[in-house]
Amino acid sequence: MSVTLHTTLGDLKIEIFCESVPKTAENFLALCASGYYNASPFHRMIPSFMVQTGAPANPSPPENPKGGRSIYGPTFEDEIRPVLRHNERGIVSMANKGPNTNGSQFFILFDKAPHLDGLNTVFGKLIGDESLQTLAKLEGLEVDKKNRIKEEVRIERVTVHANPLAK
């Protein structure tokens, strides 16, 4: 199972770990399929660490708060799996504000980050050379003092490839 994030810088194809983290996978795939991530900005980037996205492009509280929400309500619980680690470039993981606060935001690693193991739910990884090239372009962008990318970069749309959760 995979999705392609078509961004303003190029494509990011993500393999989703559906069997290992089913609730997280269902949330991400449902948001992808619904168009939730369309026009979502990459709003935070820390060079040599990660880039973050997944907040709604047009927040309208309370249904669509600024920080985003899950398909289960505002947040849902972690699915920490010891075999899924923040151990390489291209790992995709849920952003959160502490234990069991997953919503819609996620990040992609530029490098391994073992300090996140046990804290954030890993649910996928980038696949393919084009994805890694796009990730390199993202990492090369300038950021301000608050780690906001100076150039606007967005997810334009998402393609879901063979969604096993589709009903």
Curated annotation (Swiss-Prot):
PPIase cyclophilin-type domain location? 1-160
Q: According to the lineage, what is the superkingdom?
A: Eukaryota
Q: Which GO terms describe its cellular component?
A: catalytic step 2 spliceosome
Sorted alphabetically, the Gene Ontology BP terms of this entry are: protein folding
UniProt cross-references to Pfam families, sorted A to Z: Pro_isomerase
| Sorted UniProt keywords | Isomerase, Rotamase
- Mind telling me which residue stretches traverse the membrane in this protein? none
Q: Name one GO molecular function term.
A: peptidyl-prolyl cis-trans isomerase activity
- Could you tell me what reaction this enzyme catalyses? [protein]-peptidylproline (omega=180) = [protein]-peptidylproline (omega=0)
What EC number(s) would the UniProt record show? 5.2.1.8
Q: Does the keyword Transmembrane apply?
A: no
Family designation? Belongs to the cyclophilin-type PPIase family. PPIL3 subfamily.
PANTHER family the record matches: PEPTIDYL-PROLYL CIS-TRANS ISOMERASE-LIKE 3, PEPTIDYL-PROLYL CIS-TRANS ISOMERASE-RELATED
Function, as annotated: PPIases accelerate the folding of proteins. It catalyzes the cis-trans isomerization of proline imidic peptide bonds in oligopeptides.
Q: What is this protein called?
A: Peptidyl-prolyl cis-trans isomerase-like 3
- Organism encoding this protein: Neurospora crassa (strain ATCC 24698 / 74-OR23-1A / CBS 708.71 / DSM 1257 / FGSC 987)
The gene name on file is cyp-10
